[in-house]
Amino acid sequence: MINAPRVCVQVQSFYVESQSEPDEERFVFAYTITVRNLGRHEVQLLGRYWLITNGNGRQTEVQGEGVVGEQPIIHPGSEFQYTSGAVIETPLGTMEGHYHMTDHQGKAFQVSIPVFRLAIPSLIH
């Protein structure tokens, strides 16, 4: 059994009304992600994979190196936080995915990003 480093991911999403155009089926959402290293050694975030699903069930996959132009090294007991965004065609959707990371010995591992909702405030009860 391989012991992957302990990394926690927390997400908060919000609707960006000022950049959205509902009449044109353009709904802009931002999300802030905090990646915490709960382990005893540093880890590095090298890339990400996203599965974005709109309210009609249409899915888009996005993958790439780093996050917001960085490949941060996260030291034990510390965190890396960033804000990014997504544009979908419906007022409701979801995102989920994973990060590609390496441990202090250069061994690759993945950290899941739990599914989170993209929703305009009037849809949340």
From Swiss-Prot:
NCBIfam families reported in the protein's UniProt record: PRK05461.1 (NF003967)
Top-level taxonomy: Bacteria, Pseudomonadati, Pseudomonadota, Gammaproteobacteria, Enterobacterales
Domain called ApaG: residue spans: 1-125
Record's protein name: Protein ApaG
Signal peptide boundaries: none
InterPro entries per record: ApaG_domain, ApaG_sf, Uncharacterised_ApaG
Record-annotated membrane-spanning stretches: none
Disulphides: none
GO biological process: error-free translesion synthesis
